[in-house]
Amino acid sequence: MELILLRHGKAENTNPDGDFSRALVEKGRAQARGAARLLKSAGLLPEIVLTSPLVRARQTADEFCQTANLPGAVIQGWLASGMDPKTAMSEHAAFRDFKRVAIVGHEPDFSTLAEWILGVTGGGVEIKKGAIACLRITPPARFGNLLYLVPPKLAGETEPGD
């Protein structure tokens, strides 16, 4: 199975209603659309998209799914900020019948998850806002391989023609 980690796009720094409600800024929306265009053009779209319930992650997932012509994302509470790698892999196992699953979430959760799957320690992985990482995992094994890590600038954080 391929697990695509799509970090939410650039969001507002603060929100009067708290961290949960921080929304994407236009650059963050463009990052999500760029990621969708890139994966679509490469034939690497996921079969299903799961997202954190936080506003910025849901908005990233919505922009991504709309641009890629995919069904809407499924909100998963375990993807909220503060996700534990063991919990993530346990919850993710429910989707093992899919060849390619995308999850939209947060840092440092995604870097920690990628390092845990890759068996890397010491902060060897960084997933920036709007970046895409893809890991190949063969359940029930915990370990996997990094297939690609695309920074937001290569993923297309600007619109075509800009």
Language-model features: locations:
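Generic beta-sheet signal
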Residues: 3, 97-105
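Glycine-rich phosphate-binding loop signature in dinucleotide/nucleotide-binding domains
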Residues: 42-44, 94-99
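Short Pro/Gly-enriched beta-strand edge/turn motifs at strand-loop
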Residues: 74, 114-119
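Extended, charge-rich low-complexity interaction segments
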Residues: 107-116, 158-162
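Domain-level recognition of soluble alpha/beta enzyme cores
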Residues: 118-145, 151-155
